[in-house]
Amino acid sequence: MEKLQEYLEIDRSWQQEFLYPLFFQEYIYTLAHDHGLNRSILYESAENLGYDNKSSSLIVKRFINRMYQQNHFIISTNGNSSNQKKFLEHNKNFDLKMISEGFAVIVEIPFSLRLVSSLEEKELVKSRNLRSIHSIFSFLEDKLSHLNYVSDILIPHPIHPEILVQALRIWVQDAPSLHLLRFFLYEYHNWNSLITPKKSIYIFSKENQRFFLFLYNFHVYKCESIFLFLRKQSSHLRSTSFGALLERTHFYGKREHLVVLFHNDFQTTLCLVKDPFIHYVRYQAKSFMASRGTPLMMNKWKYYLVNFWQSYFYFWSQPGRIDINQLSNYSFDLLGYLSSVRLNFSVVRSQMLENSFLIDIAINKFDTIVPIIPLIGSLAKAKFCNALGHPISKPVWTASSDFDIIDRFGRICKNISHYHSGSSKKKSLYRIKYILRLSCARTLARKHKSTVRAFLKRLGSELLEEFFTEEEEVLSLIFPRASSPLRRLYRERVWYLDIICINDLVNLD
């Protein structure tokens, strides 16, 4: 972002809301390669054409020169015209890919600059490690003791391209840029299928992930705007810690009594209290909204959201895409965890003068459990075990050295432990570690043409044990076991901000 601001200080065209001239600037395509989600088509296409990486700058300059040639670069919106067919031939596909990469950077400029100015006004410190996905951690840490319903919501889709263009007009007021965006979206909409037999016209693919992720996130942003409004309206108890406070369990009983007694005199004051408190989180295309209320009120919320999306944003959604369930009888997958609410019973002793009472109190506890069966299925797909979870050797890795084999198994084991460190029950991870440890031993034994028992007896099992417990020993140095409060902290859930960088097991083959 700092590098982009340096370039924009020189090029003032964006300050007059003119983004289209930026398509003719070489640094835009350089930035598209530097922080792209995937490998840039600048270098990939250069390799296909026989150039090295140093020639990519020359390719960009030639591409910009071709854009200046009005007769050479013709865009036709007619899907059946001969001009468009010629435009989408092999020689023109590279140009279209280049524009899509540049557009992905250019269209983010108004949003990025507004974000920076907003942070400066609020005097907030920017953190490069924080992402929107990290907001899920606060949702999983909440006890949800005061909520009783959860709505499983699917983000409405598909969306017509023209609606998305009209929505972007609020932020991007440059008409030529909007026309170019409209062309891209209609091309995508007309083709229907992105994967074609001919690789030469495989335009809107993973190479353009950044471009389409921006459009998708903007679409989700419009859908979520109503939840942000509701969150602000239901702001009572928002500043209170979400700990399992006993007084919290009786709050709603007191509130209902308050409404009955002072309904006529304090109607305006009670509006803030009567609003339902909600807790909202989104992961990928699904979102969850936990709230408190009756089944009738939750159904009203469902149809309100459907009508609101259709009336104001023209998003066609169906009531069946919003599933309402009781929180106590529902479990859902979120960020690789199986989350559910269970009752946690506790006994409180109350002393009144000479009499004492034992009070049983049931409080909701939000558990995040490792889904052991899907995780074993992933290990079986990666050929670390069979479908039943029995460890097997990895013949493909036997050509590597012993150190490389142990290192690859160790990285997978540490990644799984690292990713699922936020689980409230870590005992299920022991089975995963056992599968990987025994699979590593069998792979080494297969390489040396020996049995697992003979191999471990010859080298000793301490090597594997020390390697797989390295992370736990590091944590034990940070949180000494001698201290009781720190020992409890050692057992608590830990959320790492870099879990989004951990690769899938299948990609480690």
Swiss-Prot record:
The keyword DNA damage does not apply. This is Maturase K. Usually encoded in the trnK tRNA gene intron. Probably assists in splicing its own and other chloroplast group II introns. It comes from Macadamia integrifolia (Macadamia nut). Transmembrane segments: none annotated. It comes from the Eukaryota. InterPro entries: Domain_X (IPR024937), Maturase_MatK (IPR002866), Maturase_MatK_N (IPR024942). GO terms for cellular component: chloroplast. The lineage of its organism: Eukaryota, Viridiplantae, Streptophyta, Embryophyta, Tracheophyta. Its main location: plastid. One of its GO terms (molecular function) is RNA binding. Belongs to the intron maturase 2 family. MatK subfamily. Pfam families: Intron_maturas2, MatK_N. It is found in: Plastid, Chloroplast. One of its GO terms (biological process) is RNA splicing. Keywords: Chloroplast, mRNA processing, Plastid, RNA-binding, tRNA processing.
